Amino acid sequence: QKCNYNYLGEIGENELLAKSSLSPSSLIIVDTRKAARKLYKKISGKKYHLSTYMTALDRAIILKNIRKELKCLEKEFPDFKNVPEERQITIVSTSLIEAGVDLDVYTVFRELKGLDNILQAGGRCNREGKRKRADVFVFELLDSKKKAISVEMDITRDLLKKYEDISDSACIKEYYERIFSLKEASISQNTMHCICDNFRYIPFKKYAENFELIDSRTVSLVVPRDEKSRQMVADLKYKQTVDERKLQNYTCSLYKNELDDLIKQNVVDDFGTGIYCLTNLDYYDEELGLLFEASDYFL
């Protein structure tokens, strides 16, 4: 067991940050980009922020800097004792850091989610098993505007209270058995062959309307922050053509209603191509990512 999983229950932002400040390096993972941004602004000292409001290129640069800082910290303080406050590292991120990101921090704090998310978050703590004790703290933010409670969250909360080690195979087995049991009726009801035995009468239109492979509420926005990306946007504007694959590193994601707000502020244009570009870079910050008002950074 590389990590000890601890359930903190409901906790305020200030209390959470006070607890994370006791660790030489900590990773705080929250469910929304706005929550990540709010926490990041409250932190003093060496800090990093990651969310999909930032371009893929900026996220890659920040991750590179984080890895470098963590290696320097471990080299200078191999036992992680008596680390001065100015050398402590705090990372605030959304769940994007849970998938395929190679980081090893001293302590992880994960907002309550499904068991799979929490175990993935734990994979960013004591990855190589060098320390005898490493902690993952699971919390629920007090006064959070986002109070969407899911089946997965309810079951995970129960299991955190029931099992000493939630990474144990018995706990994982119970988690998926309980989810399947609760969702079995819905799965059966929405299975194509259960609804209609005759192929000719399968309501394909209805299935197409209900099926979403990717969350269609989110859209991509190009942020041209260097000469290469500015030239690609110029080609898009004047030649109406561009290699979209090359633009991927310069894109961030946002909700459709957020894009609409930026369009109303005249800071986004697609030049008639359907590929939206940020035309006012005062609405982007390399630490926070996309801003929805030019004054957002100072709030």
Where are these regions (language model features)?
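A short helix-to-beta-strand connector/capping loop
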Residues: Q1-C3, G45, R87
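Conserved phosphoryl-transfer motifs of two-component systems
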Residues: T107
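Conserved P-loop NTPase nucleotide-binding/switch module
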Residues: G100-D102
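Conserved two-lobed SF2 helicase motor
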Residues: D79-E98
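Glycine-rich phosphate-binding "P-loop"
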Residues: Q1-N14
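C-terminal helicase lobe and adjacent C-terminal extensions/tails of nucleic-acid helicase motors
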Residues: N14-I29, K34, K38-K41, K47-K64, ...
